[in-house]
Every structure is written in C-alpha cells, then in structure tokens.
C-alpha cells in the first residue's frame, strides 16, 4: 500500500469526526453510525479522560468502530496509541506535540496515514519533515472537548501558515461548528474536525450533513 496522496488526504479531511466512549451518553457505535450516514469522511478514535477505557476494553471498542468505518469505506485513525493502531491494523495515527515523536511514529507505521498537531509554523515544518500526511491546527475556537487545550488562536493562524508557504493538508480543530466552518475553510483549512458538534448533537446524522454542506459550499466560493 502506498502513502495517501495529498489530494486524497485533503478530500478525506473535509468532515473529520473524532470521538471516544467519553464523548456521548449514547453508545459510541450508535453515534458513529449516524455520523457516517450523515457524510463523515474520516474518523479518529480518541479514548481520553478520567473514565477512558483501557486495555482489552479499549481495543474491543476500537475494533468495533473500525469495523463500522470499514463498511462505509471511511479510514479509521487512532489518537495517541501507536501500538494499538498497529495491533488492529488501523489506517493511521494522530500524535500531538506531547506524544511519541512523529519521526519515530512514521518509522513504525510505514505508509499508514500520519497526522500531527501543530500550533505554529515551526511545529508545522517539523511535522512535514517528520513525514506527516496532514496537520491538525487549533484550537481555532474555545473547546470543552480537550481539558488541556491551548488558548484559542482564531482562523488567523490558518491564514498565517498558508502565507508562510505551508502547503500540507490542514484540518482545523477546536470549537468548530457548521456556522464557523466557512471562516476556517476560507482561511486555508482543507477540512474541519469536530467532537461535540456531532457527538453532542441531538441528531448526529443531521449535524454531520450540515458540516459537509458548509465545507462544500465554502470550497465553491
Ligand atoms: N487529537 C487531535 N486530532 C487532530 C486532528 F487533526 F485529527 F483533527 N488535531 C489535534 C488533535 C489534538 O492532539 P493532541 O494535542 O495530542 O491532544 P489529544 O491527544 O488530547 O487529542
Ligand atoms: Mg495526543
């Protein structure tokens, strides 16, 4: 299997749903199915928080959600846990600045998708050097989904990265909704990643569809 192309990566980043067992009162599988029906293009399993599953329970949930994504042809990305991603043959991993070194992760995962969090030009350039296929930039707006999140940066960081010649596929993260999606796409993001905008929505399918429409319309401008 070859590395994903930049063009396909950008398409996959359009509506990037992220969740784990702690992000909804409902079973994760039910929420994910509705999100996939609504048009989610990429999924990240992010199992974090004080009551996060561990060990066999975490792997069992990962495999369950991976199976669901496979039926929709949507790539399955694992957050932080590189060993789990390899054990279940996930489609990729996402690591942040405080996780395993991205260069080391690239060596371990071969051609799988590698996503890296970046907050500035230096971190973006380092991620590219390390072999990232995309970078997650944010939090763009205040978020309640990550208790150790940095200060919200606003869409300006996206514009700044593009002005500094960063051309790697970028997904915006942090407080993203269908209402602010146009601003982040116009500022230079290729897609949006969300947790609560879908996982906490009364209708995850409609929420995913609204995000997909907002990204599509912003790209037409
Ligand atoms: N999980 C993420 N996914 C993305 C993605 F690009 F995929 F949208 N961007 C950023 C993060 C944040 O990654 P990190 O800084 O390690 O914190 P955590 O492990 O708590 O998520
Ligand atoms: Mg992390």
Curated annotation (Swiss-Prot):
Its EC number is 2.5.1.3. Keywords: Magnesium, Metal-binding, Thiamine biosynthesis, Transferase. 2-[(2R,5Z)-2-carboxy-4-methylthiazol-5(2H)-ylidene]ethyl phosphate binds at residues 143-145, 175, 195-196. Mg(2+) binds at residues 80, 99. GO terms for cellular component: cytoplasm. Its cofactor is Mg(2+). Coiled coil: none annotated. It catalyses: 2-[(2R,5Z)-2-carboxy-4-methylthiazol-5(2H)-ylidene]ethyl phosphate + 4-amino-2-methyl-5-(diphosphooxymethyl)pyrimidine + 2 H(+) = thiamine phosphate + CO2 + diphosphate; 2-(2-carboxy-4-methylthiazol-5-yl)ethyl phosphate + 4-amino-2-methyl-5-(diphosphooxymethyl)pyrimidine + 2 H(+) = thiamine phosphate + CO2 + diphosphate; 4-methyl-5-(2-phosphooxyethyl)-thiazole + 4-amino-2-methyl-5-(diphosphooxymethyl)pyrimidine + H(+) = thiamine phosphate + diphosphate. Pathway: Cofactor biosynthesis; thiamine diphosphate biosynthesis; thiamine phosphate from 4-amino-2-methyl-5-diphosphomethylpyrimidine and 4-methyl-5-(2-phosphoethyl)-thiazole: step 1/1. GO terms for biological process: thiamine biosynthetic process; thiamine diphosphate biosynthetic process. 4-amino-2-methyl-5-(diphosphooxymethyl)pyrimidine binds at residues 44-48, 79, 117, 146. GO terms for molecular function: magnesium ion binding; thiamine-phosphate diphosphorylase activity. Belongs to the thiamine-phosphate synthase family. Condenses 4-methyl-5-(beta-hydroxyethyl)thiazole monophosphate (THZ-P) and 2-methyl-4-amino-5-hydroxymethyl pyrimidine pyrophosphate (HMP-PP) to form thiamine monophosphate (TMP). This is Thiamine-phosphate synthase. It comes from Geobacillus thermodenitrificans (strain NG80-2). The gene is thiE.
């Amino acid at each position: 299997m070859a590395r994903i192309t930049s063009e396909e990566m950008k398409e996959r980043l359009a509506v990037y749903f992220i969740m784990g067992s702690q992000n909804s009162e409902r079973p994760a599988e039910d929420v994910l199915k509705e999100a996939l029906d609504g048009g989610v293009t990429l999924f990240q399993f992010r199992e974090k928080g004080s009551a996060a599953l561990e060990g066999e329970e975490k792997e069992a949930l990962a495999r369950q959600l991976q199976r669901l994504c496979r039926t929709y042809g949507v790539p399955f990305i694992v957050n932080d846990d590189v060993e789990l991603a390899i054990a279940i043959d996930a489609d990729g991993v996402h690591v942040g600045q405080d996780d395993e070194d991205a260069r080391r992760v690239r060596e371990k995962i071969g051609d799988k998708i590698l996503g890296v969090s970046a907050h500035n030009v230096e971190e973006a350039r380092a991620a590219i050097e390390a072999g990232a296929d995309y970078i997650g930039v944010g939090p763009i707006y205040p978020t309640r989904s990550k208790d150790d999140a940095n200060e919200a940066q606003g869409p300006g960081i996206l514009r700044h990265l593009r002005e500094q010649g960063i051309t790697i596929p970028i997904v915006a993260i942090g407080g993203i909704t269908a209402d602010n999606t146009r601003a982040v796409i116009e500022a230079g993001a290729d897609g949006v990643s969300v947790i609560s905008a879908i996982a906490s929505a009364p209708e995850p399918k409609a929420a995913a569809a609204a995000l997909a429409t907002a990204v599509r319309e912003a790209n037409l401008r």
